[in-house]
A protein has these predicted regions:
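Glycine/threonine-rich flexible loop motifs
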Residues: 156-168
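Bacterial Sec-dependent N-terminal signal peptides
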Residues: 1-47
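Conserved anion/nucleotide-ligand pocket segment
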Residues: 205-275
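Short internal beta-strands
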Residues: 98-104
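Glycine-rich, aromatic-lined ligand/substrate-binding cores of catalytic
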Residues: 248-324
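Glycine-rich, charge-decorated loop segments at or immediately adjacent to ligand/cofactor-binding or catalytic sites
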Residues: 108-114, 183-204
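Conserved functional hotspot residues or short segments at active or partner-binding sites
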Residues: 295-393
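Glycine-rich oxoanion-binding loops at beta->alpha junctions
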Residues: 118-146, 159
């Protein structure tokens, strides 16, 4: 099993040389890293090679061209054991980077979920950074004037409501409209080992779900881009001229601990694994731990019955005004839950049962996360998790047949 390690809170990446690690280094690694050590022990024989590392495959395409890059803080790789950003690497190689487009959370990845991101100039390179989150979500024709090629490199987490997919859609659409080639540097999907959840219905589509796919779809972002093209999901059925720089030694059933947290409130493997099941709470009066160090690993609220676990959200980078700020929440700690290989509704169902004011539990935007208006009704009507999941089966089977056409990796 291949692993892509992330050590939280700015601890350095542990480099393995010929799979030999000193006893001291291993002890230090265990001491400083609170993630499960199992993925480390199961580190595979073949190193995962991500798209950004395969410079020999994409450098020839960008020679002597005006380039725009769609990236954020995750767009990094290692050269001589040093972490370097894609933009810095391309500039160092003398390539002509005209501008950078940034998704939700910004180019540096430190803005709150939903926070409006403004255009800026990168202090390090002087390159203009154009925000694709806020009032503007799609590159304009003026933005792309004189641009000959775009590169997309952002780490996704494999959940439909993670907005990097919608940014990908609009970037592809703009490239198609302006006859610009797009190169996607593929990355692993840390939730790529299963497919589950209700398939998005048209009436519930929004920026947190633009396509008829389940909550967890089991594809890399490169495979997903091929599906956007192949299923004619771009405006007027346009096609983007697309090239995917593929991964090597990728096992979609493997565990991937990412070298950078993909957004401020997904700090580790556990939070990423729980995210598809817990994100539904974002449209309820229940906290998922924003404003704590256990984001998407705990749930709770102040007026739940007193429990053995409590937490108090506070203002912090990435969660400037968290739900229930400075209030003690009674809740559940999910950090020791088993690694999920399916979407779990048990916490959402239990949360609704615990709610004293049930008519105010589901907010108006819940159906946009759920992908339909049925899930809310099913929970209100007391259906069990197996009964609800049974209603997804036909749509999931149809999606799996569509998905199969675009898979690059076994």
């Amino acid at each position: 099993m291949i692993c892509y390690f992330y050590i939280s809170y700015n601890l350095e990446f542990l480099m393995l040389k010929n799979f030999q690690v000193s006893k001291y280094s291993l002890i230090q690694f265990i001491k400083i890293n609170f993630f499960l050590i199992v993925p480390f022990i199961l580190f595979g024989q073949n190193k995962l090679i991500v798209g950004i590392e395969k410079t020999d495959l994409y450098f020839p395409y960008i020679e002597n061209k005006n380039i725009a890059v769609v990236s954020n803080h995750t767009s990094k790789f290692y050269i001589n054991n040093k972490k370097i950003h894609l933009v810095d690497s391309l500039i160092n190689q003398g390539y002509n980077i005209q501008k950078v487009f940034a998704p939700e959370h910004g180019f540096r990845g430190n803005s709150d979920a939903g926070e409006k991101i403004i255009n800026s100039i990168d202090a390090k390179t002087g390159i203009p950074i154009i925000s694709l989150y806020g009032s503007k979500k799609k590159p304009s024709n003026a933005d792309l004037e004189n641009i000959e090629l775009m590169i997309f490199d952002i780490q996704d987490v494999g959940a439909r409501f993670y907005t990097y997919l919608s940014t990908l859609h609009y970037v592809m659409e703009s490239c198609a409209e302006n006859n610009i080639d797009l190169i996607i540097l593929d990355r692993p999907n840390p939730n790529g080992h299963y497919i589950d959840g209700p398939v998005m219905e048209k009436e519930s589509m929004s920026f947190v779900g633009m396509h008829p796919v389940p909550v967890v779809y089991g594809m890399t972002i490169g495979e997903y881009a091929l599906m956007i093209n192949g299923e004619n999901w771009l405006n007027n059925g346009q096609k983007c001229k697309l090239k995917v720089i593929e991964l090597s030694n990728y096992d979609r059933m493997g565990k991937y601990i990412l070298p950078e947290k993909p957004s401020p409130n997904l700090p580790n493997l556990k939070s990423i694994n729980l995210y598809p099941s817990l994100c539904f709470f974002e449209q309820t009066p229940v906290s998922v731990g924003r404003g704590t160090l256990n984001q998407f690993q705990v749930i709770g609220k102040p007026n739940w019955n007193k429990s053995n676990y409590q937490f108090k959200p506070i203002s912090m980078p990435g969660a400037k005004s968290p739900k229930f700020e400075n209030q003690t929440c009674n809740g559940i700690n999910l950090k020791n839950e088993k690694y999920l290989s399916e979407l779990s509704l048990k916490w959402l169902i239990q949360g609704y049962k615990n709610e004293k004011n049930k008519e105010k539990f589901f907010k108006s935007g819940f159906h946009k996360l759920a992908g339909n208006k049925k899930l809310e009704k099913q929970i209100k009507n007391g259906l069990s998790e197996p009964e609800i999941k049974k209603s997804w089966v036909d749509d999931l089977n149809k999606f799996k047949k569509i998905r199969e056409k675009y898979l690059i990796y076994n």
